[in-house]
């Protein structure tokens, strides 16, 4: 399974990369600092899943996920450590 990671925190990006890369059937095909970069990586590489932080600069994970779904690029999976109901409801739409 080919996976792209998008998070504005370098420690989170590297941690996720290390965990995912240790799994035999998973391959990290790209790492992005924001949603716009993640969308471009999905367009460039055949990707199965994009792990997206909800809150990022330039383009957040919710907007990136909408584009990925509209263009049928990959399956987005949104991640957050925030407990904000409004943000969660926006992501579920």
Predicted regions and their residues:
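A short, hydrophobic beta-strand element within the central beta-sheet of small alpha/beta folds
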Residues: 74-83
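Short amphipathic alpha-helix used as the core "switch/output" element in two-component signaling
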Residues: 40, 62-73
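Short hydrophobic/Thr-rich beta-strand motif most characteristic of the beta2 strand and flanking loop
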Residues: 25-33, 41
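The feature encodes the CheY-like receiver
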Residues: 12, 57, 80
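The short loop immediately C-terminal to the conserved phospho-acceptor aspartate in CheY-like receiver
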Residues: 48, 54-55
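Active-site residues of response regulator receiver
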Residues: 7, 53
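Acidic catalytic/metal-coordinating carboxylates
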Residues: 34-37, 58-63
């Amino acid at each position: 399974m080919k996976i792209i990671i998008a998070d504005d925190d370098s420690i989170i990006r590297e941690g996720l990369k290390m965990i995912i890369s240790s799994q035999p059937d998973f391959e990290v095909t790209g790492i992005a600092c924001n949603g716009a970069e993640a969308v471009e990586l999905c367009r460039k590489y055949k990707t199965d899943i994009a792990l997206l932080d909800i809150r990022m600069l330039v383009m957040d994970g919710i907007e990136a996920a909408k584009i990925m779904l509209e263009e049928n690029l990959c399956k987005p999976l949104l991640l957050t450590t925030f407990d904000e109901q409004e943000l969660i409801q926006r992501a579920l739409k």
